[in-house]
Amino acid sequence: MVPHLVTALTGPINELEQRVLDSMPAIERWFRLEWMEHTPPFYCAVDLRNGGFKLAPVDTNLFPGGWNNLTPEMLPLAVQAAMAAIEKICPEARNLLVIPENHQQSTFYLANIVQLQRIFHMAGLNVRIGSIDPAIKKPITVALPDGDSVTLEPVVRGKRRIGVKDFDPCTILLNTDLNAGVPGILEDLHEQYLLPPLHAAWATRRKSAHFKCYEEVAKRLGKLLGADPWLIHPMFERCGAVDLSTPSGLDHLGTQVEALLAKVRRKYKEYGIKEKPFVVVKADDGSRGMGISTMRDARSVAELGAMLGARQPAPGAQDILVQEGVLTRERINEAVAEPVVYMMDRYVVGGFYRIHAERGDDEDLCAPGSSFVPLAFEQSTHLPQPGVKPGASAPNRFYMYGVVARAAMLAASYELELSDPEAEAFS
C-alpha cells in the first residue's frame, strides 16, 4: 500500500484521481500479481509532475540519493522495506557495504549515506561505507553539520570479492550511478550480490528504454482504470546520437521536436486544454552535461545548438531524448514544486517536494537553487468507516502519486529484465 502523506493538493479531487481512489483494490491486486512475476529494483526514486489534468513520471532514479530528505517518521517504513528486500535477495546476509559517489565531499550527500547506513543497521545488518575513489587511500571521517559523522574506507579487491579492511560483505549496495563507466574493481563479483546490478548504471541504461517500458505499463494501468494512458504517460521521441554543432544535427532535432509537439497539440485539443504545449530535451544516457531545455517550438533548437556550440571543447554527438513536458500545478509557499516518491523493494516508503522559487511551472526544478520540503504523515482524525468505499472517508491524496511511482518502478523492472546480459535471449 501507500502511506497517507500530506500533499500540496488542496483543490477538489479531479476525475483521474477519483478513478484511482475508486480502483484501489483492483490496483493493489494488479501490483501484487506483477510483483509475483517481476523483481522490483532494490530501491528507486521517481520524479513526478502533476499538471492537474495529467500526472506523469519524468525521471526514474535507480541509485537515489536524498534519503536524508525523508522525515524520521518514515524511517520505520524504510527499515521494514529494507528487511523485506534483503530477506528476498540474501536471507543469510550479515554484512552490507555501501559504495557512495566518488569525489563527493558534499555534507548534504554524505547525510544521505548516513541515513542509508542507519536504515540498514536498523534492519539488522553490519554496515560499512566503502569508497572506490582512488583519492581515498585510508579511512577518513567526515563530520556533518547535524552532529552525525561518516567514515569512508578504501575498498579492497580480492580475486572475486570486494570489501574493506577486516570486513567481508555478502551484499554490495551501490549509491553511485556510474555514469562515467563501470570501474574494473566492480566487475566479475560472482560471489557477492551487487545491488542494483551493473546494467542499471547509466553506462548502459537509456531513458528512452525506460519510458518505452513505462508506455506499456501505462497502457495496462489505463485499461484497468478505464482511462486514457496519456493521462499518466509523457510521450517521447528518441533522437539517437545527434551532433548539435552541425546543421544536420539541429535539423534532425528540430524535426523530432515539431513531431512531438504536434502529437501533444492533438491531445490538448481532444481534452480542451488551453495551455501551450511544450517539450523537454535532455540526454538519453542520464549525463548532466547538456542540461534540460524547455522548448515550445523548433526555433528553440537553434538557441540550444548555439549554447552548446559555444562550449570548448564541443560536446560532439550525444544520445538525445525529446519528452512531452508536463506542467506542475503544485506550490509550496508560492514556489513551484514537484513530488519525489521514494521506494525500496516494492514498497513506497516516503517522499518530499523539490521546490525552486526562481523556476516556472514548465521548467526543470532539479537545478542549483532547488530545495526540499519533506512530506509529513496525515494526522487525520477521520478513520475510514466500514461499508464506505475505499478512499471515500479520508482520501489519501498521496495515493495517486504512489500508484504512478510504482508503475514507473514496474517499468524499471521490465527495463532491467530486457537489458540483463545474463538473461536468456527472447525471440
Please annotate each region the language model reported.
Residues 1-28, 38, 44-45, 56, ...:
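Low-complexity, highly charged intrinsically disordered N-terminal segments
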Residues 2-9, 35, 63-97, 356-427:
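C-terminal active-site "lid" helix and adjoining low-complexity regulatory extension at the edge
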Residues 38-64, 282, 325, 337-346, ...:
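Conserved metal-phosphate-binding beta-hairpin within the catalytic cores
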Residues 39-42, 120, 165, 333-336:
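Short solvent-exposed loop/turn micro-motifs enriched in small/polar/acidic residues
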Residues 47-52, 62-64, 102-103, 154-156, ...:
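Short, flexible loop/turn elements at secondary-structure junctions
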Residues 54, 256-266, 271-278, 290, ...:
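Phosphate-binding site of ATP-dependent enzymes
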Residues 81, 104-275:
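Conserved N-proximal alpha/beta basic substrate-recognition cap immediately N-terminal to
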Residues 237-250, 278-306:
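Glycine-rich phosphate-binding loop of ATP-grasp-fold ATP-dependent ligases
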